[in-house]
């Protein structure tokens, strides 16, 4: 699975692995990325997202995908998620 996310803002972090003898070797810490289908109540369909587990908890705390996408800034979203957020805003405005 690619370590790219559509929600959550997580990216691999680099640093040093330090042994007992203090020898340092470079390594990467990968985020816990999952592919999920989250239900959008406003759109009436599921949206497939690649999301970090911490962002998945944030979506749950916000009360669902719709509220989460409307709450965060569009600059923090990928183009595909911006499109979904725009569709949600348009549907809510029409209703």
From Swiss-Prot:
Domain of life: Bacteria
Span list, region Disordered: 1-28
GO molecular function: structural constituent of ribosome
Annotated keywords: Ribonucleoprotein, Ribosomal protein
CC terms in the record's Gene Ontology section: ribonucleoprotein complex; ribosome
SUPFAM superfamilies from the UniProt entry: L28p-like
Any single biological process term in GO: translation
UniProt similarity note: Belongs to the bacterial ribosomal protein bL28 family.
Name this polypeptide is given: Large ribosomal subunit protein bL28
The organism of origin for this protein: Magnetococcus marinus (strain ATCC BAA-1437 / JCM 17883 / MC-1)
High-level lineage: Bacteria, Pseudomonadati, Pseudomonadota, Alphaproteobacteria, Magnetococcales
Gene responsible for this protein: rpmB
């Amino acid at each position: 699975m690619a370590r790219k996310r559509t929600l959550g803002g997580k990216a691999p972090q680099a640093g040093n692995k330090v042994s007992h003898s203090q020898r340092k070797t470079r390594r990467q810490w990968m985020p816990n990325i999952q592919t999920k289908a989250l239900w959008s109540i406003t759109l009436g369909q599921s949206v497939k997202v690649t999301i970090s587990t911490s962002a998945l908890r944030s979506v749950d705390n916000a009360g669902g995908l719709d509220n989460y996408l409307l709450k965060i800034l569009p600059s923090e979203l990928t183009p595909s998620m911006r499109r979904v957020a725009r569709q949600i805003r348009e549907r809510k405005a029409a209703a």
